[in-house]
Each structure stands twice: as C-alpha cells, then as structure tokens.
Amino acid sequence: MQVEKDTVKKIVIVGGGTAGWMAAASISSLIGKDFEITLVESDEIGTVGVGEATIPTFFALHQLLKIDEAEFLSKVQGTIKLGISFENWHKLNESYIHAFGHTGKSCWAAGFHHFWLKGKECGYSDDYGCYSAELSAAKAEKFGFLKQNKLNYAYHLNAGLYAKYLRKLAEKNYVVR
C-alpha cells in the first residue's frame, strides 16, 4: 500500500529527556510548522540531571539546530573533552584514554599504525598516544578554539539542563508538549 506523502500531518514523540527533546528539536528544525509535532512526557518521571558525555559527531546535530556553542556551553554547564578515559581498562588501576581525532600521519604507502608497529618492534617508537595531538593536549590540560589545525573535541554536560535547552529550541519551532 502506498501512502500519499501529504496524508501525514501529525507527529507524536513519546518520551522526553534528552532523547525525546533531541528528536523533537531535530524533526521540527527540518520540517518546521508544516506538521503538528507533539511531545508526550511524564511529569512524574523527571530528567536525571547527571553528567552526559558526547562524541565529536554530535556537532552535526548542533549544526542542524544552529546552536551557538558559547551560549550552549553556558546554559548546560558544559565542558570540553578531548577523549574518553576508560579506568581499569586492562588491569586494576590502569587507564586507557581514547582520544578523539587521528593518531599519527599516514602516507601513501600505509597507515600510520603500520609504521608505529614496526618502530615498536625495532624499539624506537614511543607510546602510540604520543602521536595524538588530542591526547597530548588532554594530558597537559590544554585546549583552545583554533581557526586552523583544530583539535577534535566533544562535550560533557548536565543532561537535565540539556533537555531544557533542547525543549526551548523545539518549542520555538512549534513543538507542543
């Protein structure tokens, strides 16, 4: 059965929090007021205001929503992060940091990791993380918004405040709760 594309006029999003309001803000920014968008959420089940982590692909969503980064960080008590730390990763009291971005520089012959492995085998490669600008910056606790040679980063933010922020964006685009 084929459905006429103009037969759907109402969209209902069930569930709030960051996921629900993210969906509402995204959909409403794409289709605007051509559709009636309603978000249904419980007043009894609140958003947990704990820290929420993102990854660099999050920027695509923020570009879609035309979010001003400085305002956003202020409103959601956000901080910048350059990677994800995995505590007790291999052994107790050892950690591994997965840095965002590329490690080393590949060339036409092969990927960087091939050269690094050969160097390690021969005894003259440093730790793999030493070749990551993001990891080096994270360990030095340094970050700056650069125009060129930007570091890859993401955010750590308050989930409750982020849900409220997204709700305001969605409601500006005619989403009704």
Which residues fall in each region the model found?
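Beta1/beta-strand and adjacent pyrophosphate-binding region of the FAD-binding site
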Residues: 6-19
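A short, Lys/Arg-enriched amphipathic alpha-helix followed by its capping loop at the start of a domain
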Residues: 23-35, 61, 173
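Glycine-rich FAD pyrophosphate-binding loop
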Residues: 28-50
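A short, surface-exposed helix-loop junction/capping segment
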Residues: 37-42, 143-151
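Dinucleotide-binding Rossmann-like beta1-alpha1 core, especially the glycine-rich loop
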Residues: 50-135
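Short beta-strand to alpha-helix junction loop
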Residues: 109, 149-168
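A conserved beta-strand/loop element that lines the FAD pocket in flavoprotein oxidoreductases
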Residues: 171-177
